[in-house]
Amino acid sequence: VHLRRQRQMCIRDRVYAGHQFGNWVPQLGDGRGILFGQIETSNGLKDLHIKGAGKTPYSRFGDGRAVLRSSIREYLCGEAMHGLKIPSSRSLIIFTGEEPVFRETTEPGAMIVRSASTHVRFGNFEYLCHNDKKELLPELMTHVIEEYFSEYNELENKFELFFESVVRKTAELIAHWQTVGFAHGVMNTDNMSILGETFDFGPFGFLENYQPDYICNHSDYQGRYAFNNQPNIGLWNCQALAAALSPIIEETALKLSLIHISEPTRRALI
């Protein structure tokens, strides 16, 4: 990757909403992360994000910290995904220190610098739609298209083409997951990237032996995010995004894109 130049941007934490285990949560946000930079590279735009930076306005009852154990796991999985040629965020640097972090046990704290093509999530659109901020949807959509889908910028149906691309990228990503036996574990809509990148590594796992109902998240009591249910959840999440975009995209266009989700999945699996 060759660095072309760094873009000027404000250091910020972002608000979003989401469906967590199918339940609507009207406000979430970067509870322990800060987006501090964006660079232009030979592989396109890359966000730079610190995870574990401390409390933000969206930390709720959390301490805003990350632990060394999960930071190392995220680093290793991001590199594994990259090696497998599966779209993924990656980790650049891990910092650790002597200050303890209290979870189920006391653990060493850490911060991780993450790079990703974008940090725009399904949940950013959900937040605007379902919190009486629908008038801001076209502004966010226009910005996202200018940044990441510039080939659609001058087209009249650019919003529809954006959604169709998100659906396709999501389907292809999950198809890649299924081929390598990867279970994400927390496929909430706020953990879904609009560019179809593996994002927000948590209690993920890989199948050691073929076990289609494998559950890697011990908090997933009902198996919502079981390995064999990931394609269904991908579709469910795209439907949630469609609902959030319904004020600015006609229902017929949204439904057509969702109907086509099975075809890119099938092609990717082949």
Question: What does each model-found stretch correspond to?
Answer:
Residues V1-R7, I11, I259-I270:
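Single conserved hydrophobic/aromatic residue that forms the stacking wall/gate
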